[in-house]
Amino acid sequence: MKTFKNKEELLKEWEINGACKDGVEFNKSCKDLQEILEKCPLKFRRWRLIKGYVQFAEHCPWEEMKGWEWVRLLLAQPQYEDKCYWGKLTGGDWADLLIEKQKYEVKCDWEKLSEADWDYLLYYRPQFK
């Protein structure tokens, strides 16, 4: 988990971490690290959290994340499960999550899974039959 002391450290990391051009430009447009952390748009913030940049969690608008965004984040960084708005996950989102992380079966809203979602899930994880 990478943390930064200042904007310059962050900019240096962003030269090598595969960040998109728009994300780099956003960083440069801010006056300091605190402004970056506070004002970072969700579309950049979720990528940064997935990559393990934990400082971006503090000002995250968790309630605005969509189900598929939660799946991607939880697969990469399960420590954020206590922030998750589980009701945002669709049946397809649940299938994607459960295929990779069966531990979330206790959280699953099974009624959201359609027949197609069940077929998909059971193909990869027949133990859920």
Model features per residue range: what roles?
Residues 1-129:
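Ankyrin repeat (ANK) tandem alpha-helical domains that serve as protein-protein interaction scaffolds
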